Curated annotation (Swiss-Prot):
The keyword Ribonucleoprotein applies. Keywords: Ribonucleoprotein, Ribosomal protein, RNA-binding, rRNA-binding. InterPro entries: Ribosomal_uL18_bac-type, Ribosomal_uL18_bac/euk. GO terms for biological process: translation. SUPFAM superfamilies: Translational machinery components. This is Large ribosomal subunit protein uL18. It comes from Pseudomonas putida (strain W619).
């Protein structure tokens, strides 16, 4: 693995350990060069309660690797989480900087009704 990826995963591990200690439901984000994925994971980490990505049929047609797509994913994951009965989550940015697509997804999820 590259040094950049190793340091990102180390940051993610530290944050996830803290969330596991607090036993909170988390909104986990993964970003690749072409797509962005979001999952709402149960407090014990065993179940995915809601998920959305730019690979979903609703979002696949437009551009998938930009801020607009991340905003749509954020709104969709918030809608699905509310349907699953989740309103409070901890934001797991997976070691990515809170900037650009990750920030856009978080802001859209907040607007959709999720509380961080």
């Amino acid at each position: 693995m590259t040094d950049k990826k190793v340091t990102r995963l180390r940051r993610a591990r530290k944050a996830r350990l803290k969330m596991h200690e607090l036993e909170v439901v988390r909104l986990c984000v993964f970003r690749s060069s072409q797509h962005i994925y979001a999952q709402v994971i149960s407090a014990d980490g065993s179940k995915v309660l809601a998920s959305a990505s730019t690979l979903d049929k609703d979002l696949r047609d437009g551009a998938t690797g930009n801020i607009d797509a991340a905003t749509k994913v954020g709104k969709l994951v918030a809608e699905r989480a509310k349907a699953a009965g989740v309103s409070q989550v901890a934001f797991d940015r997976s070691g990515f900087k809170y900037h650009g697509r990750v920030k856009a997804l978080a802001d859209a999820a907040r607007e959709g009704g999720l509380e961080f």
